[in-house]
């Protein structure tokens, strides 16, 4: 056993096109990642800079942006922000609305989803909303903060069934449908 000093977190990459040579993570392990972020191709200028920096003999210079202590302070700051009951209620309702057996799930979620987001999704919706509010200089998150992080928090937690794949229904569409009941 190794003691890992805080702050400790894991970043992982996954190539959405080619899975050969990689081992897909089971849903239970994917659920431990707070966000799934999609990264688009870089701009022409950024790609040229990447090529120049990675094909030369020069060693890249990396400068820290934050110390470990500063990062821990920011993490504690986010946790100290209060989440209003309306935000917690919305996050829980949104996560629950992705579950096909939940009475408030939409007909499409019931038809196309095999497995919806679990309680960890509700936690991460609130934590993501708190972080967004903190970055924006606000003392507490609101429902719009939850909405802004919802796709990144939920996308990798919702498993569609064969019918969804056959009908060309993607997770992103189902999440927009799942959000509708929670808005009321």
Residue spans for each PLM region:
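Canonical AAA+ ATPase core
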Residues: 1-81, 130-132
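Conserved AAA+ ATPase small/helical "lid" subdomain
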Residues: 61-122
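Alpha-helix N-cap and coil->helix boundary residues
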Residues: 25, 46, 66, 86, ...
């Amino acid at each position: 056993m190794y003691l890992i000093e805080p702050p400790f977190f894991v970043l992982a990459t996954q190539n959405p096109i080619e899975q050969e040579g990689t081992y897909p993570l089971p849903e239970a392990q994917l659920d431990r990642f707070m966000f799934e972020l999609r990264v688009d191709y870089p701009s022409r200028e950024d790609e040229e800079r990447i090529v120049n920096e990675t094909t030369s003999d020069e060693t890249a210079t990396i400068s820290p942006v934050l110390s470990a202590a500063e990062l821990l302070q920011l993490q504690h700051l986010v946790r100290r922000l209060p989440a209003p009951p309306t935000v917690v209620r919305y996050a829980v309702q949104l996560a629950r609305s992705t579950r096909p057996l939940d009475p408030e799930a939409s007909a499409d979620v019931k038809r196309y989803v095999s497995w919806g987001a679990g309680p960890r999704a509700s936690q991460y919706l609130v934590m993501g909303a708190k972080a967004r509010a903190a970055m924006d200089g606000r003392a507490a998150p609101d429902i719009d903060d939850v909405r802004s992080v919802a796709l990144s928090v939920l996308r990798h937690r919702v498993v569609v069934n064969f019918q969804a794949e056959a009908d060309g229904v993607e997770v992103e569409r189902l999440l927009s449908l799942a959000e509708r009941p929670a808005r009321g």
